[in-house]
């Protein structure tokens, strides 16, 4: 497997030449998760800006717009990261409507480092089946999140 620095260089190259939608495919290439996505907070909703699906299928409606208070991303905003290999067994998600629907999820914040310094969204890998994310892929996800602010904010 290529080094973390190599994977990030590839991600940055595609991000700069083809945009975030295509860069998510690069980000997803070394993880077991079906989906990689970038969500943007707008009011009380998280809106999917870009989604890569390994199967190339149309994005399910329930993934397009998610109420913030029902999202797994709320934990990313509050705690700086959220990771669960199996949401159906995760007590932190008790009473969450997506518990047991989205099974595995790892998300990190996207921060507006060019303006307010606030969290504006999340970058995540997730699946409808159980997966764990390797430590090096978590590092790639964290570092990639620092590269996508302009693409997320459209600047």
Label each residue range with its predicted role.
Residues 116-119:
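Glycine-rich acetyl-CoA-binding "A-motif" of GNAT/NAT acetyltransferases
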Residues 43, 55, 113, 128-130:
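Short coil/turn motifs at secondary-structure junctions
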Residues 104-114:
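A short, aliphatic-rich beta-strand micro-motif
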Residues 30, 97-103:
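Short loop/turn motifs at secondary-structure junctions and domain boundaries
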Residues 35, 107, 122:
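Short hydrophobic/aromatic beta-strand element in the GNAT-like acyltransferase core
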Residues 41-46, 57-97:
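Regulatory sensory and allosteric helical modules in signal-transduction proteins
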Residues 1-67, 143, 154-155:
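Intrinsically disordered, low-complexity terminal regulatory regions
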